[in-house]
Amino acid sequence: MNLTFLIPVKLESEDRVRNLKTILTYLLTKFDAKVLVQEQDTTNRFTKLIMPYLTKRFGIISHRFQYFFDKQNTNYFHKTKILNDLLLKSDTEIVCNYDVDALFPETTYTNAYQAIKDNQCDVVYPYGCGIYQKAVTYKQETFDKFLNSDLDVQSLDKYATISNSTIGWCQFVRRENYIKSFMMNENF
């Protein structure tokens, strides 16, 4: 795939760490795409909390995965700036702005990617209709079981509830047009 996932992150909770491990495992296993992660915080937590897991799981993955740390003196998380930074570091035809709390069936990703590759559109928000989404709350045991399975997201349906679509951002974009459109607005 000529695709890079752009993932801004701040690892401020156990839940965020678990979410990041989940999506990195899923993306690196299911897709032949690049993944760029940029952590922005006062302290680098990724190297201690995520990297040992990735190294154990995947070995050397430097050809598809890159991590960047942006040290901040405050707790402010400037997501739009991080996305712009990652966009400029990417080198693929298509990028995907990706939150750590979004996970879809594999076909959702491939359909969104293919729609852009086939020049049907320049941007895809790979969501269903309406203002609701599935929200999955799970215990560590469920998390471990999912990561050691075939990563079929439908296996998580039994833990899902329907909730308002207020979290979980994902946006596939043709990189060249994204840059031409002046990227993300960093002023808010």
Task: Give names to the regions the model predicted.
Residues 2-4, 27-37, 63-65:
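Short loop->beta transition adjacent to catalytic acidic/histidine clusters or analogous donor-positioning motifs
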Residues 46-89:
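Active-site-proximal specificity loops/subdomain of glycosyltransferases
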Residues 22-26, 81, 85, 111-112:
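Alpha-helical elements of Rossmann-like donor-binding domains used by nucleotide-donor carbohydrate transfer enzymes
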Residues 14-16, 42-50:
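Short, charged/polar "capping" segments at the starts of alpha-helices
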Residues 105-186:
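Conserved catalytic core of nucleotide-sugar-dependent glycosyltransferases
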Residues 1-26:
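N-proximal low-complexity "stem/linker" segments adjacent to membrane-targeting elements
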Residues 32-44, 68-72:
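Short beta-strand/loop segment that forms part of the nucleotide-sugar
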Residues 93-103:
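Short beta-strand-to-loop acidic/aromatic patch adjacent to the donor-nucleotide binding site
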